[in-house]
Amino acid sequence: YASDGSELGRYFYENRSNCRYADLSENILNALVATEDARFRKHSGIDFRALVRVAVGVVTGLKDGGGSTITQQLAKNLYGRNPDDNLILAKLKEWIVAVKLEREYSKDEIITLYLNTVDFSHQAMGIETAAQRYFATTPKDLTVEQSAMLVGMLKAPGNYNPLVHHEAATGRRNVVINQMRKYDFITRA
């Protein structure tokens, strides 16, 4: 800080500012649920329908999305994954933590925790920092297109960073918008 009390700069491990559920727009919530976990409000941390879909995809070679719920992804974000663990053991740990999270927290708290812990690349950890970094706005004021862009980044933040890979990010954003249409969160204009 300067002698007049103004901030000269910041030093941080992660550039993160947490927000509350009330600070999130319906657009960001809908984009996230439509893309990452369409049955989020219907399961208790593990979506067995999604697991069956993934298993069928593995057997047939026709993969159609992942099987991890938002709660399982939150568990991974909070506790990480040991690179030495095999995938099945890592997933089992995530399932256990996800079930515990679902017992302790409401769905609104879980989705807020998730959005506060995700990495949006370009030194933006969490939705508050990402909304500011990429769109100079707050999570409450994110449009459908902005929300879709940010949620699209979650698949691979570095690869879908709109500041670096605009074309790829725009394509991924369109995938998210199509998911929002598919699950009736938005209609065609």
PLM segments and residue spans:
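Short, solvent-exposed loop/turn elements at domain surfaces
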Residues: 7-11, 40-42, 159
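Short, histidine-centered active-site or binding-site loop motifs used for metal coordination
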Residues: 12-15, 36, 78, 154-155
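Terminal hydrophobic membrane-targeting helix
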Residues: 1-27
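Flexible, acidic/glycine-enriched loop-and-adjacent beta/alpha segments
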Residues: 20-70, 125-128, 135
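Residues immediately flanking
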Residues: 3, 35-38, 117, 137
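Non-catalytic, structured segments within soluble enzyme domains
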Residues: 61-189
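Mixed-charge, polar/low-complexity N-terminal
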Residues: 5-8, 14-15, 60, 85-86, ...
